[in-house]
């Protein structure tokens, strides 16, 4: 299988997102990279499912709460930007204050 660098990046995000999802299910608080991967993977999947940029910008703020991440993580993530593939092309999705 010959993957482009972009495809490798998406695969890495998805894999890290799965690890984060499993840790959340066990009640483990997520650290910075896990929280980033969890939200990013959800945004990428939402785009593939046909959600709009505006819907994803809102959705990204509902995925994690302060109680689900380690202390200090919300302050480390003022925004997340993901290049997602939509049915009509690639667009940048920006989520401000993703962990409230």
From Swiss-Prot:
SUBUNIT field: Heterotrimer of UreA (gamma), UreB (beta) and UreC (alpha) subunits. Three heterotrimers associate to form the active enzyme.
SUPFAM superfamilies membership: Urease, gamma-subunit
Cysteine disulfide links: none
NCBIfam families (alphabetical): PRK13241.1, urease_gam
Main localization, broad class: cytoplasm
Subcellular location: Cytoplasm
GO molecular function, one term: urease activity
The name this protein goes by in its record: Urease subunit gamma
Keywords: Cytoplasm, Hydrolase
Pathway(s) this gene product operates in, as recorded in its UniProt entry: Nitrogen metabolism; urea degradation; CO(2) and NH(3) from urea (urease route): step 1/1
Pfam families xref list: Urease_gamma
Enzyme Commission numbers on file: 3.5.1.5
Catalytic activity: urea + 2 H2O + H(+) = hydrogencarbonate + 2 NH4(+)
Keyword tRNA-binding: no
Ribosomal protein among keywords: no
GO cellular component: cytoplasm
GO biological process: urea catabolic process
Alphabetized InterPro entries for the sequence: Urease_gamma, Urease_gamma/gamma-beta_su, Urease_gamma_sf, Urease_subunit
CDD domains, sorted: Urease_gamma
